[in-house]
């Protein structure tokens, strides 16, 4: 499910943003789309178009390869265009071992260094693709970087990413009215808590994808066992709707917010939509069952703040 792009006045723009990609853009652009998000599987895609080349980076591999490749094909993406897959952490809903055999030979699977022991123990080793470890910024392509921040989540932690695209342009207000160089996107899920370091890491991104996992009231009223409730709400599990909103308000994203990992049992799109009414950023709510629309990174800042 998604929410139409909203201007500050509440009017909706409805571009045909769910259609296949079609021809490569003549000008550099970055597109983002969530294929699925939730406890049954998480996978998103970044598409980077520059100098006549289209490249894709998958963020998490929590859907089966067959399902993911089918969705990508429907979106106009080929397997050979997948250059990178980057993992936030290694929970079963964020990585499927079937990808070890099916990532293209030229692709890189990026795993944080602190996750490597668990990756080895669970047999996460690509057959054809390169296994790339990191603990500092990743250069995906010239002018495309991912800056990591490790946050608390269960035992091994989770990586929050700030993606920076030097070749893309955004359209904020500049003195001469020209497009400003550079665009950025934050991706944060399974966090557990909001810290000043997190806010600083994500501050001012053009697009912010962040989890809004549960409503505390619904969580308390649910039939879930107490240990599970404590795991989720205890500071190293997931963000509540209010915690997510606090993080968004602190980070001040320029144009668009994409909400991730909504609990089907302890949350609802209607609850989170109401919490974000009147905001000056566009809002998209991801789903476990269908992809979101395409979100262009860096293209709508001026329109959303006009």
Feature roles, as predicted:
Residues 37-40, 63-65, 90-93, 152-155, ...:
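Short beta->alpha connector loops
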Residues 195-291:
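Cap/insert and terminal regions of metallo-dependent hydrolase folds
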């Amino acid at each position: 499910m998604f929410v139409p792009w909203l201007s500050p006045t509440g009017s909706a723009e409805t571009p045909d943003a769910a259609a296949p990609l079609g021809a490569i853009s003549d000008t550099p652009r970055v597109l983002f789309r969530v294929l699925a998000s939730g406890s049954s599987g998480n996978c998103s895609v970044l598409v980077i178009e520059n100098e006549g080349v289209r490249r894709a980076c998958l963020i998490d591999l929590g859907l089966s390869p067959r399902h993911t490749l089918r969705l990508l094909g429907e979106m106009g993406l080929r397997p050979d265009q997948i250059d990178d897959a980057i993992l936030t952490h290694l929970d079963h809903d964020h990585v499927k071992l079937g990808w070890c055999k099916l990532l293209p030979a030229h692709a890189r699977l990026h795993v944080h260094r602190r996750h490597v022991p668990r990756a080895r123990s669970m047999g996460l080793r690509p057959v054809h693709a390169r296994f790339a470890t990191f603990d500092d910024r990743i250069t995906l392509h010239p002018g495309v970087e991912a800056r990591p921040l490790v946050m608390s989540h269960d035992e091994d932690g989770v990586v929050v990413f700030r993606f920076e695209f030097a070749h893309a342009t955004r359209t904020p207000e500049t003195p001469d009215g020209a497009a400003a160089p550079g665009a950025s996107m934050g991706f944060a899920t399974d966090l557990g808590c909001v810290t000043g370091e997190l806010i600083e890491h994500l501050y001012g991104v053009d697009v912010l994808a962040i989890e809004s996992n549960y409503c505390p009231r619904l969580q308390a009223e649910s039939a879930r066992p107490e240990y599970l409730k404590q795991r989720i709400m205890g500071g190293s599990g997931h963000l509540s709707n209010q915690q997510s909103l606090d993080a968004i308000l602190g980070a001040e994203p320029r144009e668009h917010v994409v909400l991730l990992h909504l609990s089907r049992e302890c949350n609802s799109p209607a609850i989170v939509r109401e919490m974000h009414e009147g905001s000056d950023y566009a809002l998209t709510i991801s789903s476990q069952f269908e992809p979101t629309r395409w979100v262009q990174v860096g293209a709508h800042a001026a329109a959303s703040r006009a």
